[in-house]
Amino acid sequence: MGFNIWSLLIILLIVALLFGTKKLRNIGGDLGGAIRGFKESMREGEEEEAQKRADGESSDEPEPLEHQDEPAPEQTTQARESSSARQSAEHHDRSTS
């Protein structure tokens, strides 16, 4: 059940009578302005991406972390001693079994 041209014209006439032509014109202008603004922002985003690619940057890749020259923290003497004691005890348990 498709709409023919006469059905569409009658619907358009009813809408125009309900809202008035001035209000419909304003709604159409607002909608057109929103679409233009959206297209413009999309174009600007594409231009920024192209500029980044031209500069050698890539937005898809994460930026590399800066290398820190600080050495890793060393274990404390107490932690090393307890680790050695555990290893000795395990070795002793294996040898006596």
UniProtKB/Swiss-Prot annotation:
Record gene name: tatA
Family of the protein in this entry: Belongs to the TatA/E family.
Biased composition (Low complexity): 78-87
Chain positions covered by the region annotation Disordered: 28-97
Residues annotated as transmembrane: 1-21
Annotated GO MF terms: protein transmembrane transporter activity
Subcellular location: Cell inner membrane
Quaternary structure (record): The Tat system comprises two distinct complexes: a TatABC complex, containing multiple copies of TatA, TatB and TatC subunits, and a separate TatA complex, containing only TatA subunits. Substrates initially bind to the TatABC complex, which probably triggers association of the separate TatA complex to form the active translocon.
Sequence ranges of Basic and acidic residues compositional bias: 37-56, 88-97
Function statement: Part of the twin-arginine translocation (Tat) system that transports large folded proteins containing a characteristic twin-arginine motif in their signal peptide across membranes. TatA could form the protein-conducting channel of the Tat system.
Alphabetically ordered keywords of this record: Cell inner membrane, Cell membrane, Membrane, Protein transport, Translocation, Transmembrane, Transmembrane helix, Transport
GO biological processes: protein transport by the Tat complex
Keyword Transmembrane helix: yes
Membrane-protein topology: Single-pass membrane protein
A GO cellular component entry from the record: TAT protein transport complex
Pfam families referenced in this protein's UniProt entry, alphabetically: TatA_B_E
PANTHER family documented for this protein: SEC-INDEPENDENT PROTEIN TRANSLOCASE PROTEIN TATA
Repeat found in the keyword field: no
Protein name (database record): Sec-independent protein translocase protein TatA
Xref: NCBIfam families: PRK02958.1 (NF002813), tatAE (TIGR01411)
